Amino acid sequence: MARDFSLDRTRNIGIMAHIDAGKTTTTERILYYTGRIHKIGETHEGASQMDWMEQEQDRGITITSAATTAEWDNHRVNIIDTPGHVDFTVEVERSLRVLDGAVTVLDAQSGVEPQTETVWRQATTYGVPRIVFVNKMDKLGANFEYSVSTIHDRLQANAQPIQLPIGAEDEFEAIIDLVEMTCFKYTNDLGTEIEEIEIPEDHKERAEEARAALVEAVAETDDELMEKYLGDEEISIPELKAAIRKATTDVEFYPVLVGTAFKNKGVQLMLNAVIDYLPSPLDVKPIIGHRADNPDEEVIAKADDNAEFAALAFKVMTDPYVGKLTFFRVYSGTLSSGSYVKNSTKNKRERVGRLLQMHANSRQELNTVYSGDIAAAVGLKDTGTGDTLCGEKNDIILESMDFPEPVIHLSVEPKSKADQDKMTTALVKLQEEDPTFHAHTDDETGQVIIGGMGELHLDILVDRMKKEFNVECNVGAPMVSYRETFKSSAEVQGKFARQSGGRGQYGDVKIEFSPNETGGGFEFENAIVGGVVPREYIPSVEAGLKDSMENGVLAGYPLIDVKARLFDGSYHDVDSSEMAFKVAASLALKEAAKKCDPVILEPMMKVTIEMPEEYMGDIMGDVTSRRGRVDGMEPRGNAQVVNAYVPLSEMFGYATSLRSNTQGRGTYTMYFDHYAEVPKSIAEDIIKKNSGNKAE
């Protein structure tokens, strides 16, 4: 079966934004206008098409990125709706990895908000071209110029409007198109009746100034256009469009559009911009992977149906009707249902049962998927997030995704024996779906400990265990994931010698331990000269250190950011073994704990609090009392914004405290930023508490 849409007529886009900027509503409207749904679902009524998990409809926020296919102007648009809440940044990362372009939605009253900065940063990391949609122009306090200024100030982005609004709040009635210098007026509530009119006389001067600024900004990225611009030559509409498209796909320029998705204005024009300015799979750089058996040999996955099949699995979900669904993006080649593929990441052969194209939570069966497509497969048993799927003869591994370690943990206990088995199943499935969710059994207490990216993240996962898997469980108090590190250097010896009849055990190492830079992780250097420690025992020394570091040296937390240089040692011809050198390495680490000034580190959260000015004093005092460090303040509209770094351990239950301090008028967001040293008195408490737990 031939493909319905050629590659140049395919767009893979994400909708990304801060929580409550109107992202899901915007996606809804796209689906409405592209004929995918017949009645518009409102997020605040809990009836939105994209938010199909029960928890999402209850909370009115988007948690999982549902992939949806729509058609517009003879193009296929695959849309991934991404969550805007910081606890779900991993979902955003996953989506961005497989997109070719994105629409960043801003709230016209607030402009760029903290989570916008986070997702913008992630999109920049992955080199994703973006257009910006300033939404909610009908909202009280909507200010288009202010929103655009925040893009420049907070994101340092080369962005210029390609549209201007006429009016704001209740008066928002039309949109000026600065590329074609025309105006679109809306004559009905559903936004289906649009009248193209001339730019009103009293807005002409403003439009001409804005167009000149647009041409200048785009000309800076295009030498030919710059020559014309400087020579005062006429720049035609096709020339300007082509230059905007090139600058946008090269991630050098960001067109800014305007509208209100809720009141159905500006969405069709935004869809036109997606087609006009965002790249097709042919416009983006080919994805570079490497050979499975040789990580140094690069392999290119070219967007071509005739090439070898290569795809990246970016999401795993459990569907109540068809079981495990694996969402994947095809980078090259084609795939038919019923065929076999190779999971080159795990070196496993898998059979693709059925291929589905998803629309929020309804589905359409496909026989074949082509390069550039986003689809879901049923029947892949061993494939997880970030795995590469390829043809059986192909041997490519696409660059995978790195997921952050959890910063918060809870204990969960099943209420009954029946819940115990169900909980095990639930935890396995939830970990398959979400790589930032970890679960393990504590060896000492026997408790099941779950870890995630924040309180809301774990709340929702516990909620899903109850609703989807019928697991009743008791949840313990949140626990912080502390870490340990060394502050100074020392040379130490670890010697393990045991003789108890027959063959003995002998291993002897001398290691220099020193602090590594923050985020540098563990670095092991083999500086042995002359074979004083035979080569076959070196990996055992490194393994022994890694194992011991997992349990720390002070309070049982993993030891991080440490360098270890093995420079001397000795061995015995008969008695030395891998095990003996492993033990010797762990003894060296114990010795280092006495000399290297070990400290406990705690996760520091970047917290942004927004509230009316009159509560500023109370909030600042509260932040300080939580051992927070204020990093700056700025006015935002008629509110004040405080940026601070606060230890995670001090942020539990902060939502309640903020509510009472601001009479419900304050909001905050936080995400993990870095690890920092714990004050001595608190470190002593942590050590005491942990040694008490071990004694029990």
UniProtKB/Swiss-Prot annotation:
GO terms for molecular function: GTP binding; GTPase activity; translation elongation factor activity. Residues 8-282 form the tr-type G domain. One of its GO terms (cellular component) is cytoplasm. Its main location: cytoplasm. It is found in: Cytoplasm. Coiled coil: none annotated. Belongs to the TRAFAC class translation factor GTPase superfamily. Classic translation factor GTPase family. EF-G/EF-2 subfamily. This is Elongation factor G.
